[in-house]
A protein has these predicted regions:
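Active-site beta->alpha loop and helix N-cap motifs at the rims of alpha/beta catalytic domains
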Residues: 2-158, 165
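Catalytic alpha/beta core domains of metabolic enzymes, predominantly
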Residues: 115-222
């Protein structure tokens, strides 16, 4: 019994350690359904704010500002293929800094087939130098343990190598945040592959939170 208690305590401690630093994600539409984030989340909880196709970027700014005012750490998405040009990106980053003190963003390609403007991928966003201009020195980039329907495995590997090189060269603290994953072996095998290929960026695993079967099925199709 004593041994079992020790093992159970160790397991609980491991779970608690693994759960530290977690974040959640919210859409502007989802945020509108929440009266006060401070009533359901601990202070300084990291909340990623999505930038979905067809969404007004200023809607993301508004949610980011609200989260900041309610005591959260807001991390807005930057969807490369949904941005018009560097001027729009510059203005958006300026708004995030001025309205919510943002010092971290999550950069993704974005779920559209045809870019609306000058950017096609997240690396192009990084290469503008605008993050550094606005004092944003920490950023997440997408990880794809299950691959991507939009990008070949070779292109994904090349992009990850470029992001590792960028982080070393520019001093920006990049990390990988993966797509939603349901099977641990897939994630673990992917991590071994990218590490063997030279990845040194920290990895945050995306998992779905409590949801209905219908919602989980929709996540699985993303």
């Amino acid at each position: 019994m004593g041994k079992m208690r020790i093992d159970m305590t160790a397991n609980i401690q491991q779970i608690q350690q693994a759960a530290q630093g977690w974040s959640i994600e919210v859409t502007p539409a989802g945020a509108a359904k929440i009266d006060n984030f401070a009533a359901c989340l601990a202070p300084e909880t990291t909340v990623n704010v999505t930038f979905l196709p067809g969404t007004d970027p200023m809607a993301t700014v508004a949610v980011t500002k609200r989260l900041h005012n309610e005591g959260m750490k807001a991390v807005p998405h930057l969807a490369a293929r949904s941005l018009k040009d560097a001027d729009q990106l510059d203005g958006l980053l300026a708004a995030y800094r001025a309205e919510a003190g943002v010092d971290e963003v999550l950069i993704i390609g974005g779920g559209v087939d045809n870019p609306v403007g000058a950017f096609d991928n997240s690396m192009q966003i990084l290469e503008t130098g605008l993050l550094q201009k606005h004092g944003i020195m920490r950023a997440g980039v997408a990880g794809h343990p299950e691959g991507s329907p939009d990008i070949s495995d070779i292109e994904i590997a090349d992009a990850l190598a470029a992001k590792n090189a960028f982080a070393k060269r520019e001093g920006v603290k990049l990390y990988i945040e993966t797509q939603f994953c349901f099977e641990a072996p897939i994630v673990l095998n992917w991590e071994k592959r990218v590490r063997a290929a030279g990845n040194e960026l920290p990895i945050r695993i995306g998992i779905p939170g409590p949801a209905t079967i219908k919602t989980l099925f929709r996540f699985a199709q993303i």
